[in-house]
């Protein structure tokens, strides 16, 4: 599905500020571990506000629950508010047992939802259109960022995230094809005013024996 087709479908399907779609990219980004000097690889978390196609990306060490929730927290802080619905693509850190009617959610993610005031609605495994839209948006974002960083020797995860942030800003501020606005302009005009305020207290993850 072409980028312009994805954007058109997303903006037609979703209400402003209603949903945040989140997933990890299928591929990782390399960086140099400052302690060992060896090449390490980071997981790339990507969040997308589908109405505006506004993107947030950051890197974390793994797809473990604590890293996923940390990335999600950074995403919400970047957005400056909370959408009522968060849609994970059946990540293991988010969804324990995928099911169309009653998916088994990770307890820590449920705790986070209660803290921030959002509902978790995983992608319907039987709805290929929604799943394809999320995966395509993630793939396109990753490819654009990875292409810009290719060949650079980036030392440390903090430096990698700084480089990713720079490319993320450029992506959101680039005029979209056949549209008179950028992702950033549309997000701030149409979506951010609809978001609920962030809670005063930062979410702290509770650990469960069965996580």
Residue ranges of model-derived segments:
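Active-site beta-loop-alpha junctions of metal-dependent nucleic acid enzymes
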Residues: 57-82
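RNase H-like two-metal-ion nuclease catalytic core shared by retroviral integrases
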Residues: 88, 99-100, 120-143, 160
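Two-metal-ion acidic nuclease core segments, chiefly of the RNase H-like superfamily
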Residues: 102-120
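Active-site-proximal acidic segments at structured loop/helix or strand boundaries
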Residues: 138-211
């Amino acid at each position: 599905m072409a980028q312009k087709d994805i954007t058109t479908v997303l903006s037609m399907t979703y209400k402003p500020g209603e949903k945040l779609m989140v997933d990890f990219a299928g591929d990782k980004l390399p960086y140099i571990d400052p302690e060992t000097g060896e090449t390490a690889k980071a997981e790339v978390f990507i969040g997308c506000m589908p109405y505006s196609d506004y993107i947030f990306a950051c890197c974390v060490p793994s797809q473990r629950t604590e890293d996923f929730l940390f990335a999600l927290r950074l995403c919400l802080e970047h957005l400056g508010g909370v959408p009522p619905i968060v849609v994970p693509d059946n990540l293991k850190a988010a969804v324990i047992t995928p099911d169309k009617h009653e998916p088994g959610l990770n307890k820590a993610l449920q705790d986070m939802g209660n803290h921030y005031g959002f509902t978790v609605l995983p992608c319907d495994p039987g709805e290929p259109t929604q799943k394809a839209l999320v995966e395509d948006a993630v793939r396109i974002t990753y490819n654009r960022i990875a292409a810009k960083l290719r060949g650079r020797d980036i030392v440390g995860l903090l430096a990698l995230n700084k480089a990713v942030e720079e490319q993320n800003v450029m992506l959101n501020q680039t005029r979209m094809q056949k549209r008179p606005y950028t992702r950033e302009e549309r997000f701030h005009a149409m979506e951010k005013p609809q978001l609920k305020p962030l809670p005063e207290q930062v979410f702290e993850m509770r650990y469960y024996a069965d996580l």
